[in-house]
Design a protein with these regions (language model features):
Chain B
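Conserved ABC transporter NBD signature motif
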Residues: 58-66, 78, 111-113, 118
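Helix-to-loop junction immediately C-terminal to a conserved catalytic motif
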Residues: 50
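ABC ATPase C-loop
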Residues: 147-148
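Conserved ABC ATPase signature
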Residues: 130-134
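The feature captures the beta-strand-to-loop junction immediately N-terminal to the Walker
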Residues: 35-37
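Helical segment within the ABC ATPase nucleotide-binding domain
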Residues: 169-182
Length: 357, 234, 330
């Protein structure tokens, strides 16, 4: 039985390794700008969703403030780069500042609400996130309000930067790919994401991860054994917040633009929820699968829907169903069905199916 | 035929099996005492009968009716009342409202009300007070009163003497004796003196299994058995 | 100091909080006429928020179900009422007060009926399968909220909708130099009537007794022979209908509504329920009035802080009383 469970889990790991390999070679495999955009977004969202899974999957508490922490990191880096100019000092300072604000907020929210009731926590994080959103649009002299801010990142990441030059002074190519700053930026995103993700995998594999699982299985029992449940939950909440914040900084450096839509809006929160549920809660690897599927769907399926709707304009009902404006509606429906029928998500169900077979 | 029959009952809470094999016949009439150490499964047995936890596999039957899978409310309507360990008092409601809720149609039968006031005079005294303001003993009285405001066949009582003053325990024993004339009581008790004074039949539950069952008189006379099952020094 | 606190407790305890807030605001604002206007606005707003929040609080108290989709009922109520008022624009503009009242009555009735039906559907399809699983409950109700908001968007479109007010409720009454908007008085009174009716039901009827008992100890009510799940459906429907009514009244108050209304109100409703304490309608009323007053006073005194004021209020109260001002006895 255990052996077969392992086989299912191994299959999931294999898929995740494959995804990692595809992301590692993405610039060479898919040589267009849009694909690179997608690959970078996938990297960042894997970290973001995994850090959310740390919270929801390993402690069973639901936070709606995860985008807020992501936003702190993004705005931290963005504001520093805007105010101080495109230097590494700005990157470092902004990232740290964002992470620090996230940490402080997480501690405050955690201490205030985690000791009362898990359900309070969900409500309070929602309230906090909405205030953060309002503040971002009101403090427009710093945040650019609804328009957001654009800025320059360190020279290394400029598209015009030549990493390797040929003898005649042009950018060298490797397998047809220009070795320019854009490539450096992508690998910066990839490497940062990999480091953060591996850190989280190690964390859930450590004794702390075991304790978290014990708390998740039976809170009262864990408390009785002597684990300080509130302390552990607050700790995980803080770790998850800081990692989300770092992911936000990385994304801000990649995009060279930060605004409510890319870093703070509630729709990102919904995306995260969808990804973690689709992938499978409490598995870490599920985050990878969920993020890949959702980002691909956002970039390609939505367009496909639009094209299909136009093509089928004369067929009754279908254009309505395929209308890209209805995208969120269908996502919501799928989300509900998933939570009902596949609460373990893809990663969890795969491991299960192999066991049953 | 026995009033209540538990047949190879197993109950799990989450992933932990609390009851492994509880088989028990509770005869009609008198007080049946369920003894056992802390955590042996006494409370779980009562809650499983009441349908608050679902035993599976195994079955519970009451006068030949299979209770397994029935809703708690429907089990209660068969004439089974429950006095839980925490007494289950509605603190925000008055004493009167607590009792009104326990009646079948929302109005009191004069005789049973008079009986309750005679058994527990404090309840009449605090009739319109919020139940949270009662003392522990008075809350226990209210909880028992709720169980007997309507005629019942069987009352499940979980550790009624826990934390009560001796004088109140005496009053409680008196009340139980009177109630048990017409109603069968299934009593979970840690206080062996109290149990011995009241019980007719008894069983000891140990680690989720019935370890001994018989008459209270025999058990009370057998000090060795008591020592081995309850670790009582006396 | 202790003596002072006991005295306060005797004359009403935390119930005096709105009074204290109003008093402090009076001195900060300094202009009596502005203060009266703001206070009336705050009370009216509080009453409408109370309607929206009361169902959420009761449903949570009774079944430990926190419905994140609750604000969908508010939105639907607002849009349904707006549509009905739009169709009956002729009646609204008529000189006859009877026609005016008939129009607004029909609009509110439509919202309530919609709330009842939607509540029944929501409970059966969305909530029932996940009664005892908080995590999935939160996720599923959030999913339902997304779907509901998209439905509103699909039916009513994304552009703001004008909500006409009946003739007899437009304009203001002048009391000396104080102008009081008629609609605010109307909203306050209607809210008050609903509150009193709720209060009466809960304290004087058998079903109310069952609800109060169920909020405290669900298992015990079942052990006494009552099916809480059936009671819960009724409470859920009632709560949804009240939320829809609140939304309908809010639509008339704002006179211009957008599909974002639900999301905005959701935060406020949550804050109210947290402040007031879950499971008691007295607590919910107290929280709603506090939020209404503070929002209006701060909006006047320091407009920049207005949006954050609710949040600050919530934090302050949670630090003081982690379970809210008046939680149900548990």
């Amino acid at each position: 039985m255990t052996q077969e469970t392992d086989r299912g889990a191994d299959f999931v790991k294999l898929v995740v390794l494959l995804i990692a390999a595809l992301l590692l070679f993405a610039p060479f495999l898919f040589q267009d700008i849009r694909s690179l955009e997608v690959a970078a977004r996938i990297c960042v969202f894997i970290v973001l969703v995994a850090s959310y899974d740390l919270l929801i999957g390993y402690t069973g508490i639901v936070s709606f403030a995860h985008t807020m922490f992501f936003g702190f990191g993004a705005y931290g880096a963005a504001i520093a780069l805007r105010q101080m100019g495109p230097g590494w000092d700005a990157v470092l300072l902004g990232t740290l500042a964002g992470a620090l604000v996230s940490l402080v907020m997480a501690i405050a929210i955690g201490l205030l609400s985690l000791r009362v009731k898990a359900i309070f926590f969900a409500m309070i994080t929602l309230a906090a996130a909405s205030v953060a959103m309002v503040l971002a649009s009101q403090l427009s002299q710093f945040t650019g309000g609804e328009d957001g801010i654009t800025y320059k990142t360190p020279d290394l990441f400029k598209t015009a930067t030549k990493l390797v030059v040929t003898e005649d002074g042009k950018v060298a190519r490797l397998f047809g790919v220009k070795l320019n700053g854009k490539l450096a930026a992508y690998y910066f995103v990839f490497a940062s994401s990999l480091v953060l993700f591996v850190f989280m995998i190690r964390l859930v594999g450590s004794p702390i991860g075991t304790i978290l699982k014990a708390i998740r299985e039976n809170e009262a029992r864990a408390e009785a054994i002597g684990y300080r449940v509130v302390a552990y939950r607050t700790f995980v909440f803080c770790v998850s917040a800081v990692i989300a914040s770092l992911a936000g900084s990385v994304y801000a450096i990649w995009l060279k633009y930060t605004g409510p839509d890319t870093a703070l809006s509630f729709s990102i929160m919904i995306d995260i929820l969808l990804m973690v549920v689709i992938g499978g809660m409490g598995t870490m690897y599920g985050a990878v699968i969920g993020a890949v599927l959702m980002v691909l769907a956002q970039y390609y399926l939505r367009d496909l829907m639009g094209t299909a709707a136009e093509a089928l304009a004369n067929v009754p009902l279908l254009p309505f169903i395929l209308n890209p404006d209805m995208w969120l509606f269908w996502l919501g429906v799928i989300f509900i069905l998933l939570v009902y029928f596949f609460p373990k998500g893809i990663a969890g169900s795969l491991a299960r199916k192999e066991t049953e077979a | 035929m026995s009033l209540l029959t538990l047949n190879a009952m197993q109950t799990r809470i989450g992933q932990y099996a609390v009851l492994h094999d509880v088989t028990l016949e509770v005869p009609e009439g008198g007080v049946f005492v369920l003894l056992g150490r802390n955590g042996a499964g006494k409370t779980t047995t009562l809650r499983s009968v009441m349908g608050l936890w679902k035993p599976s596999p195994g079955s519970v039957s009451f006068r030949g009716t299979d209770l397994t899978g029935m809703h708690t409310a429907d089990i209660a309507r068969l004439g089974i009342a429950f006095v839980p360990e925490d007494m289950g008092i509605f603190g925000g409601l008055t004493v009167e409202e607590n009792l009104v809720l326990a009646t079948a149609n929302g109005s009191f039968d004069t005789d049973s009300l008079a009986r309750i006031w005679r058994l527990f005079p404090a309840l009449e005294q605090f009739w319109t007070k919020a139940a949270w303001s009662l003392s522990g003993g008075q809350k226990q009285m209210l909880s028992v009163a709720r169980a007997i405001i309507e005629p019942r066949e069987l009352i499940l009582i979980d550790e009624p003497t826990k934390g009560l003053a001796p004088s109140i325990i005496d009053a409680m024993a008196e009340a139980f004796r009177e109630i048990s004339v017409h109603t069968t009581l299934l009593l979970v008790e840690q206080n062996f003196e109290f149990a011995r004074a009241l019980g007719h039949q008894m069983a000891v539950i140990e680690d989720g299994r019935i370890a001994h069952t018989g008459s209270m008189a025999d058990f009370a006379a057998n000090k060795d058995l008591q020592a081995s099952l309850l670790s009582l020094s006396a | 100091m202790d003596r002072f606190l006991t005295t306060i407790d005797r004359i009403g305890g935390v119930n005096l909080l709105p009074l204290a807030v109003a008093l402090v605001a009076f001195f900060l604002i300094g202009v009596p006429s502005s203060w009266v206007t703001l206070t009336v606005a705050g009370l009216a707003m509080g009453m409408m928020i109370f309607l929206m929040a009361s169902g959420l609080s009761l449903v949570f108290g009774l079944m430990d179900v926190l419905n994140f989709g609750h604000s969908a009922f508010v939105s639907f109520g607002a849009f349904v009422a707006a549509s009905v008022l739009g169709w009956l624009a002729g009646w609204l503009g008529a000189e006859s007060v009877v026609l005016n009242i008939a129009a607004i009555f029909l609009a509110f009735l439509a919202a309530i009926v919609f709330g009842l039906a939607a509540g029944w559907f929501f409970e059966a399809v969305i909530i029932k399968p996940v009664y005892h699983d908080h995590l999935r409950q939160i996720l599923i109700t959030v999913g339902a909220l997304i779907v509901a908001e998209q439905m509103i968007l699909a039916v009513w479109g994304g552009t703001p909708i004008n909500v006409p007010r009946p003739n007899f409720l437009t304009g203001a009454v002048l009391l000396g130099d104080v102008a009081i908007e008629k609609y605010r008085v109307f909203a306050f009174l209607l809210g008050l009537v609903v509150y009193l009716a709720l209060k009466f039901t809960l304290s004087r009827t058998r079903i109310g007794l069952l609800i109060r008992a169920g909020v405290e100890n669900r298992e015990m009510v079942e052990a006494l022979g009552f099916r809480i799940d059936r009671l819960f459906v009724a409470v859920f429907m009632l709560g949804s209908a009240l939320a829809a009514l609140g939304g309908a009244m809010w639509a008339g108050y704002e006179t211009l509504i957008t599909p974002a209304l639900g999301a905005e109100m959701m935060i406020v409703v949550f804050i109210v329920v947290i402040i007031g304490g879950l499971g008691s309608i007295e607590g919910t009323l107290l929280g709603a009035i506090m939020v209404g007053l503070v929002a209006n006073y701060v909006g006047f005194l320091a407009p920049k802080l207005a949006l954050a004021s609710n949040m600050i209020l919530m934090m302050a109260i949670l630090l003081w009383r982690p379970n809210g001002l008046r939680p149900a006895v548990k």
